[in-house]
């Protein structure tokens, strides 16, 4: 019956129908392929480098990028394409295996050197004091739990965003003080990074600083005000402390720790709370999620906060709080493999403060 009906149809109509069906199928296949590629890229799979211009235009739109000239846009596109190559290489790295993935993010039009210069900020001031007492932790590590995370006890404040102000040192320092305050008073407060940026006479504001010198400067100033009383503006200014507004936290001392191995860091973390630490941030720029196993260790340039540790699929990891906003990494956090000095995390001495 269907054969007879087909014979009765006008041949030109049949040709038209066939053309429409084929065209729709082709469009569907192409659309599916493009969507699949985009979805795979979002999940950290390989980016199709032939589609780099499309990825870049989407990136510009998604992150509201504005370039001052065609020359600048072309330069950013070139860097963006280089970063795609690196992301693909990292996602195919057998060292990290399936544990860490990388993807396009808001930094993907910046070179590593540009990002380190603008969005980190760990550096050595010309004048370096050292009032913090050094403690050597040479006892064998305790047999503590395999998993521990201060976030689960509501002792870690929200993710901050330092922007293009190189004051990671202030953010990491105060994040640890905020956690110690929460451990003592069972409530979270946001302290003023801008106060340290403006009023710390040793460190260099948005041009860099160190963790232990920040603790020392807090002691010299007498304390820290809240973020509400002295809000963040992300640039260097003259010190604008209002002496009529109270310091909510004061410090009476600080410590720096020498440890025989990373395992001892677990004991310290559980005992004193989240710990500010120095790292090399070059390899975490395009991080998306998972545990980083392979991370550069070519010089410390960024400060972050150690908040926990655990094991995933047999891989032991550390959890760090970053200061690049909650739209980066795992909602603002990242994880690295334990016991490999990932990102140079144990190159410098860990520091903590003592609340008054």
Swiss-Prot record:
Synthesized as an inactive proenzyme and activated by proteolytic removal of the inhibitory propeptide. Cysteine protease that plays an essential role in host liquefaction to facilitate horizontal transmission of the virus. May participate in the degradation of foreign protein expressed by the baculovirus system. Residues 1-40 form the signal peptide. It is an enzyme of class 3 (hydrolase). GO terms for molecular function: cysteine-type peptidase activity. Belongs to the peptidase C1 family. It catalyses: Endopeptidase of broad specificity, hydrolyzing substrates of both cathepsin L and cathepsin B. Keywords: Disulfide bond, Hydrolase, Protease, Signal, Thiol protease, Zymogen. Pfam families: Inhibitor_I29, Peptidase_C1. Residues 41-144 form a propeptide. Disulfide bonds join 165-206, 199-239, 295-343. The active site is at 168, 302, 322. Its EC number is 3.4.22.50. The lineage of its organism: Viruses, Viruses incertae sedis, Naldaviricetes, Lefavirales, Baculoviridae. This is Viral cathepsin.
